[in-house]
Each structure stands twice: as C-alpha cells, then as structure tokens.
A protein has these predicted regions:
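C-terminal, low-complexity/hydrophilic appendages and adjacent surface loops
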Residues: 65, 69-85, 158-217, 222
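Extracellular glycan-associated modules
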Residues: 241-427
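Beta-strand elements within well-structured catalytic alpha/beta cores of enzymes
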Residues: 1-10, 86-89, 111-116, 203, ...
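Short, solvent-exposed loop/turn and secondary-structure capping segments
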Residues: 1-2, 13-28, 98-99, 117, ...
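Substrate-binding rim/cap in mid-to-C-terminal beta-strand-loop elements of soluble/periplasmic
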Residues: 24, 31-150, 321, 325, ...
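Metal-dependent active-site segment of extracytoplasmic phospho-/sulfohydrolases and closely related
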Residues: 1-17, 44-48, 64, 368-371
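Active-site rim elements
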Residues: 57, 72-76, 95-106, 123-131, ...
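Active-site regions of oxyanion-processing enzymes, predominantly non-cytosolic
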Residues: 1-23, 80, 143-144, 225, ...
C-alpha cells in the first residue's frame, strides 16, 4: 500500500519579500531588498540563485498563488491554503485505478486507522510495555470503493501560532491570528495580544469549498457554535493555550529545545553534528578552546557551524586566525589576528559574549592565541534561533555549505595541521 501526500501543509510564505536566505524569516530578522541584491551580487548575481551558495525562497505572493484556489499558505491554519493537500493511494491488485477524486473531508490522523482496517488488524494497547494513546482518526477505507459515500469525519481542529480553524459537518470557522508569514519581525501588538481579539470568519464548505464567501455576519449563531466547539477540541487535544507556539520563535528563542549540556569535548575529526544537537555558538555566551599543531602559513577550517546560507566559522588563511559570522548572507562580520600563527603547537580561544543581552542582540567576539588577545570585533545582529535546518557542526574541515566565501572554492578546506581537541563551554 503506497500513500502519497503531496505538499508541506501549503506553499511557504517564509520567503516574505523574496529572500536569498529563508531562515531570516524563522529568526525574525528584518532585511531589505537592497541588502539581498547587494549580497547576491557578491555571490555572482542571479546565476547564484538555486545554487549551494544561497538558501533562496520565492516571494510570499507566489506562495498565495501556489495555494490557489484556496486562501492562505503554510503557517496559517485558518484557511485551507495552509492545511489542504492532495493525497494518492495505490494498492496494486486491491484498489482499481479511479479518476474520480474523493471529496470527503479527512485528516492525516485518519491514515493509521485506514491501514489498520484494510489489513484487518487492531490498534495495539501497548508497545514494548508502554500504554498507547487512543486512535483519534476515522478510517477512510469506506471511500475507496464508493466515491459518493457520505463523509464520516465530523470534526477537526487546526492551530499553529494562534492561527486556527475548526471543521464540523461541512462548515468551517477560521481565525487568522496575530502573525502573518510574510510580515518581517515581531507581529504588531504581540505583547498585548489575546485570542479574544481575533476576528473569525465562517464558510460553508459543502457549497463553497474554496472559502470564497464569508458567512459570519449571516450566521452568527453558527459561528458561535463552532467557536465553542474549537475551544472544546483544543482542550481535548492539549492545544491550549492558543498561540502557545509563538512563545519560542517570536518571543523567547532562548527557550527552544536544545541539548542539556553546558560543555563539550570534541575530537579533531568530529564532523556532521546537526545544529539542533550542537553547541549554540551563535547565540549563547561561550568559549571555544582548540589545541592544535600547525606548519607555517597553515590553511584550513578549525570549525564551522551552519552553512552557506548562514553560520559561523573559525579558520586559518595563510596562517592568519580568522573568525566569520555569516548572518544569512545579508551581513558578514570578520575578525582576524594581526599576524599569522608560527609553526608549532598552540592554543586558540574564541570567546563570545552578548554586548546587549536580548534575542538577536550584538555579540562581542575575542580571539586569543596562547593566552594573548590577538583580535576582537562586534557582530551587530545575531541569529536568535539557529542558522540552518539541515547543516551541521564540523571540526577540522567543512562539509555541507561554505559559511565563508574565503574558502568556498576550496571545500572542505581541511586543516593542514592537527587538532588535538576542541573544548566548548557556555559562560
């Protein structure tokens, strides 16, 4: 049995005004078109789009168009453009091909009970001794052989970051919420927002499947009924408080899920530690100490976190100790030692502290060689969440994307020396 769902909730509006590094949006960092164009020119102009040098994303207007004929996009649970996806089911020898689409309302939680029913098995009460939660879904197997069968899913709620909706027997009530994916920075008024402030819309999907006609003013009693039902379903499914998902990405990035450790010791050949599991070198006060042995005019990466679309790195370039903080391509901060390292054994330290303790606040960076300060600088804006959703921490070389353009054409730019160990500690 092959079940294929095409989509990621909806088209992505995180490109905002069009971006060369989409995690600017997730980090809530405002930027201008002029900044993007200037950075793109440094990368080679339009030809750099779609290459490993960028992490580009289309303008949010294309996301809305991509969700057509529905309203909305990913990160909006209020409208079907952010929740509805086509699904295909294939079971050769058991399901005959049928060009007639099934229009019954269903949710992804319905897939497991569907497979259970098709295979004639039941939901296990325990797995490895762990009691299992009850199944919430409703099997859609009944619709496989009967395109016109009456739908069996009566109710379904949706919620993300305060954007929410509730479906019930052909009707849907929708509240957009305080955050629009295409608006940069913190939502206006978010510090005093409450869900009670939001305006609700009402649609009769049985007659208006694309949510073109808001009936809230015509059927206030129906809207009130569905709003109450949303509160019941949200409570039953542990989805309260409404808008709780705004806490980390918008208001308190320091509370994001992260490793419990405060210190690490890495071997000199450690590579491919996902950023989610690695030390937060770009937004937590920290000290990195590296014991190494190098020849004259040594070259190579000491470590890097993130990738081409954003990250930080420390490397040697003709012996010069160099630190670079790449803020999603639109801002690069480089700190260098005044003189190259001499051949031999050394201890390199990179100390990072906040100049202003706030999400996205500026960072002071100090480079030390064998206990002596050899360089310092300030990163004007830091990344409050993370640099990359798919790149890593590497020691002694750089895999994935090149954080610095200084070694982009020399990847993986392995150190032509030896790292005996790297110690990282939060301050």
């Amino acid at each position: 049995i092959v079940v294929y769902i095409w989509g990621d909730n909806g088209s992505s509006g995180e490109g905002q005004n069009g971006t060369i590094s989409e995690l600017l949006a997730q980090n809530g960092i405002p930027s201008t078109v002029e900044q993007h164009i200037a950075a793109l020119e440094e990368l080679g102009g339009l030809d750099a789009l779609g290459t490993p040098a960028t992490d580009n994303q289309y303008h949010a207007a294309w996301a809305w168009a991509g969700s057509s004929p529905y309203q909305g996009m990913k990160l909006l649970a209020s409208h079907l453009g952010g929740t509805r996806n086509p699904m295909f089911v294939s079971w050769p020898g058991h399901i005959e091909p049928d060009p007639v689409p099934r229009t019954q309302f269903h949710h992804v939680v319905d897939l497991v009970p569907t497979i259970y029913e098709i295979l004639g098995i039941s939901h296990p009460e325990t797995v490895n001794g762990v009691p299992q939660d009850p199944i919430d879904g409703t099997s859609l197997a009944y619709s496989i052989d009967d395109a016109g069968a009456e739908g069996r899913r009566r109710t379904q709620y949706f919620e993300i970051m305060g954007s929410r909706s509730i479906y019930s027997d052909g009707w849907m009530a929708s509240a957009t919420g305080p955050r629009l994916p295409w608006v940069q920075g913190m939502p206006a008024g978010i510090q005093t927002w409450t869900p009670d402030q939001d305006r609700w819309e009402l649609y009769h999907l049985d007659e208006d499947w694309s949510q073109a006609h808001d009936l809230a003013a015509d059927h206030p009693e129906k809207l009130a009924e569905l709003k109450e039902l949303f509160a019941i379903e949200a409570a039953r499914n542990d989805a309260l408080p409404v808008g709780g998902g705004l806490w980390v990405p918008v208001m308190h990035p320091e509370d994001r899920i992260s490793p419990p450790y405060t210190a690490w010791d890495f071997a000199g050949d450690t590579v491919r530690i996902p950023e989610f599991c690695a030390p937060a070198l770009g937004n937590r006060p920290n000290r990195v100490e590296i014991r190494l042995s190098v020849p004259d005019a040594a070259n190579g990466v000491l470590y890097k976190l993130g990738g081409a679309g954003g990250g930080l790195t420390c490397f040697l370039l003709d012996g010069v100790l160099t630190y670079e903080y790449n803020l999603f391509l639109v801002q690069r901060t480089v700190v260098r030692s005044g003189a190259p390292l001499a051949a031999g054994d050394h201890t390199v330290e990179i100390v990072t502290t906040y100049a202003e303790l706030r999400p996205g606040g500026p960072l002071d960076v100090v480079l030390r060689l064998d206990g002596e300060e050899v360089g310092s600088g300030t990163v004007p804006v830091s990344a409050p969440l993370l640099f990359s959703a798919n790149d890593c921490l590497d020691v002694g070389r750089a895999y994935g994307g090149a954080v610095s353009r200084a070694y982009a054409d020399r990847m993986p730019f392995a150190l032509d020396g030896r790292i005996d160990g790297m110690h990282v500690a939060y301050l």
